[in-house]
Amino acid sequence: FLRGTPILVQLMLTYYGIPLVLRGLNQEYGLDWNINAIPAAVFAITAFAFNEAAYMSESIRAAIQAVSPGEIEAARSLGMTSGQVYRRIIIPNAAVIATPSLINTLIGLTKGTSLAFSAGIVEVYAQAQIQGGADYRYFERYISVSLVYWALSVLIESFGRFLENKMAIQAPESVDISGVGGDR
């Protein structure tokens, strides 16, 4: 469901749906939760968290499945337990594989937060609209917003490259692989 529906729809379902559920719980169990005291940001964070969890879990699942079965078999033949295989082989290799995808998802999340305005949250985009309405200089405001999002994306991407370089496994230079795969 989460990967098949737009984040804007999920934001609206969360923003309007959670208070309905809480109101029902209040009536059913005699609770005294003040629904109006919950900030709109809580609903937006909930929607973004569930949405991103759906995409990130798929990236992590694919990365785990991409770990070479030969490496896992070799670890087991050395007598490693399942826990040791996960800690020493699967998780480190899956982390290397999943990092670029997870960083890309984080960049998408950062840009997607501009949709939180539709749930009544005044974030960067909303602030630009408010200020643009005051002085009718929308274009300059939107250029500023785009530069902020671009700078955040560059920072996240740089952090991702740093992580990738830290986790990179260097192939030994002395290994000759020219004959691998046979002659054709």
Predicted segment positions?
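Transmembrane alpha-helices and adjacent helix-loop boundaries
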Residues: 1-184
